[in-house]
Regions:
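Secretory-pathway glycan-assembly enzymes, especially type II membrane glycosyltransferases
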Residues: 1-181
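Catalytic binding pocket for nucleotide-activated donors in carbohydrate/polymer assembly enzymes
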Residues: 179-302
């Protein structure tokens, strides 16, 4: 499936009205002070935002904008309808807004799978490592997942976050096994995708690999255009709480060739849509044009 520029731009704009406003936007810091932050392109010192720095600088440089609003971090932005650039939107939250941008790309779009191996050389196993991330300890899906499957599959935490200090009674020391390399993941066929604060940072490179993602229907919208991923075509679907993981794995092991085909489709989705730098830059510029003018109709763009 090859996505057109129009499809992707419309997807990234999301909740925004394509004919959003008939006049240029009036960015009022008083209205948005408690929500995103504003980058003043004339003051480079304000560009310091941890892992987001290179992407923020790129967006500022690609368009003649004096100011751009960003909402960084992992909590979906739910503010007013201003064209704020965000990393993700939450489909479970109707108030989740923003124009999707390719933020924190160094983490989410490092597609280095140079150490990948052929499907038939991979272990017929499930493998997962990650931190116990999550803003809300009581909805932390990763803790439930490791608690349920630690004794059956090679799933464990690589690190404990601040949640461990606030609720240590939810954890077991044996669940912590330390950091694993990407190569460790790629030795296995079946790689679960578990959301953290927002989307899993591993989804993109796992799709690009010869392994197959096992995941619920995507909750978060991002630069990846998750709505265009099809269950049984690009990934193998499980229930949101992974309660049917073992049943799904039984099917996978009985349908090895179909699983390999799904893995190839995922890799093709990535290679066809997100690896051409000219296309990526063109789409970014189109989004910035929408923000600058406040009046943008993608159907009239060549």
């Amino acid at each position: 499936m090859i996505l057109s520029d129009e499809q992707r731009i419309s997807y990234y704009l999301g909740h925004q009205n394509l004919n959003f406003k008939e006049e240029p936007f009036d960015f009022s810091p008083h209205e948005l002070f408690d929500h995103p932050f504003c980058v003043d392109a004339r003051n480079k010192q304000c560009l310091s935002r941890a892992h987001y720095d290179p992407d923020i600088i790129k967006y500022v440089s690609l368009n003649n904008l004096e100011k751009i609003w960003f909402c960084c971090g992992d909590k979906p932005y739910t503010g007013v309808n201003y064209p704020v650039l965000v990393k993700t939107r939450d489909t479970f939250n109707k108030l989740s807004k923003g124009v999707i941008a390719n933020l924190n790309s160094g983490r989410h779009w490092n597609l280095d799978i140079s150490q990948d191996i052929d499907w038939n050389d991979k272990k017929n196993e499930v493998f997962w490592r990650g931190a116990d991330t999550g803003h809300d300890i009581h909805r932390n899906d990763r803790i439930g997942f490791v608690s349920k499957y630690f004794s059956e599959h090679d799933v464990a935490f690589s690190d404990y976050s601040q949640n461990y200090k606030s609720a240590p009674y939810l954890y077991k020391n044996e669940w912590l096994k330390g950091f694993c390399t990407r190569q460790d993941f790629l030795k296995r066929k079946f790689l679960p995708i578990l959301d953290g604060n927002d989307k899993s940072s591993s989804l993109n490179w796992i799709l690009a690999s010869n392994s197959v993602p096992i995941m619920p229907k995507p909750r978060f919208h991002s630069w990846l255009c998750e709505d265009f991923l099809e269950s049984g075509v690009h990934y193998i679907e499980v229930q949101p709480d992974f309660s049917d993981l073992n049943i799904v794995l039984d099917w996978c092991r009985e349908n090895d060739e179909e699983c390999e085909s799904i893995a190839k489709n995922g890799a093709k989705f990535i290679s066809e849509n997100f690896t051409n730098q000219e296309t990526e830059t063109r789409i970014i510029k189109s989004l910035l044009e929408f923000i600058r003018s406040g009046l943008y109709d993608i159907k009239n763009k060549g």
